[in-house]
């Protein structure tokens, strides 16, 4: 009987390979979590409101105003969402016709663009970035624009840590000005703020930006993100968003995090993580099992190893959880390592050094 009921699910959902989140893969295993690009330290914010018997505002005005000040945009250009992930989904639901329209995404990159397209039976076109430089392949994007409504660009990119050329982004926006929305996912932009595209929202009506409080703001646990776009696009998304997407505790904590004092603390954490990243890269360069370290502008690094599977498993057994990227296009033998505290990074280095000395006759 249960098999008959399962067949009631949409065919594309039955076939769907779900997104493998860090928690879904790793659960609570280990004590050093370097697999989800989270902040290694928590922030001291608290939920102050006590009245929880009323439904929350669909779009909390105070929170939108605070974020508008932070990004220097108008309040009517901002939508609050349950993390940037909801923004990815809303755009597909609002703009793509099932079985007719398509999206483009550029692997190796964040998988939720593809997963959401599959959920809603939207065709997805993969246009890989140029190997090793990870820049956009504009020629192949142009050749694949037929029926494409949305183009997702993660910048800085997860998992490579690279940034797109701004000229390429401008060229892409010009190329698709009247035909497609270019969605720039800026989840990690606080680590390289000068690369943000917010200044160009007025010039390019087809530009949409996704933001989150999960990374530099160290608030992954509250699930709060934002869509930044022209007010007309925000109005469309407001038509289909859940009636009460942002809980009262989430809105309260998010609002507090946008106070100027907490923004300064966030910026200081970014400086610390950037320094830890440089330290970690310099230490990894001296280890014989490391084949290549890709340049990163974020709170994680992509490293190609000799014996990557064995190193991944060894770290797992030692309670150090990193993200295996070997299955992704052009990322053979690559592991993605979140930059942790100095103590966590030191422990990681010691374990890899010990492994290398034992099995590769290296340092």
Swiss-Prot record:
Q: Which UniProt keywords apply?
A: Amino-acid biosynthesis, Aminotransferase, Histidine biosynthesis, Pyridoxal phosphate, Transferase
Cofactor(s) annotated in UniProt: pyridoxal 5'-phosphate
Biological process terms in GO annotation: L-histidine biosynthetic process
The protein's Enzyme Commission number: 2.6.1.9
- Matching Pfam families, A to Z? Aminotran_1_2
Question: Which CDD domains does the record cross-reference, listed alphabetically?
Answer: AAT_like
The annotated subunit structure for this chain is:
Homodimer.
From the Swiss-Prot or TrEMBL record, give the protein name: Histidinol-phosphate aminotransferase
Task: Please name the taxonomic classification of the source.
Answer: Bacteria, Pseudomonadati, Pseudomonadota, Gammaproteobacteria, Enterobacterales
């Amino acid at each position: 009987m249960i098999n008959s009921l399962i067949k009631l699910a949409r065919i594309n959902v039955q076939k769907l390979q779900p997104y493998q989140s860090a928690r879904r893969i790793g659960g609570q295993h280990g004590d050093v979590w370097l697999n989800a690009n989270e902040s290694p330290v928590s922030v001291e914010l608290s939920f102050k409101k006590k009245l929880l018997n009323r439904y929350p505002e669909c779009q909390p005005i105070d929170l939108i105003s605070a974020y508008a000040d932070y990004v220097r945009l108008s309040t009517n250009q901002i939508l609050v969402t349950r993390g940037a992930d909801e923004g990815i989904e809303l755009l597909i639901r609002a703009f793509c016709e099932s079985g007719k329209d398509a999206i483009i995404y550029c692997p190796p990159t964040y998988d939720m663009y593809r997963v959401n397209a599959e959920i809603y039976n939207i065709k997805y076109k993969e246009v890989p970035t140029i190997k090793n430089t990870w820049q956009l392949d504009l020629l192949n994007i142009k050749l694949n624009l037929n029926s494409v409504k949305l183009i997702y660009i993660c910048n800085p990119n997860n998992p490579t840590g690279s940034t797109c050329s701004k000229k390429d982004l401008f060229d892409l926006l010009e190329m698709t000005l009247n035909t497609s929305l270019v969605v720039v996912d800026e989840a990690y932009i606080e680590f390289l703020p000068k690369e943000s595209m917010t200044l160009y929202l007025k010039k390019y009506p087809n530009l949409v930006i996704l933001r989150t409080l999960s990374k530099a703001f160290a608030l992954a646990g509250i699930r709060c993100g934002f869509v930044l776009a022209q007010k007309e696009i925000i109005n469309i998304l407001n038509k289909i968003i859940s009636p009460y997407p942002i809980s009262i505790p989430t809105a309260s904590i998010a609002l507090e995090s946008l106070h100027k004092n907490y923004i300064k603390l966030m910026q200081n954490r970014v400086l610390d993580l950037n320094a830890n990243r440089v330290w970690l890269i310099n230490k990894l360069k001296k280890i014989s099992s490391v084949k290549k370290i890709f340049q990163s502008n974020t709170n994680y690094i992509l490293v190609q190893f000799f014996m990557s599977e064995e190193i991944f498993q060894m770290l797992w057994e030692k309670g150090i959880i990193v993200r295996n990227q070997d299955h992704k296009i052009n990322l053979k033998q690559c592991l993605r390592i979140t930059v942790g505290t100095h103590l966590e990074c030191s422990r990681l280095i010691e374990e890899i050094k010990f492994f290398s000395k034992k099995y590769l006759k290296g340092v």
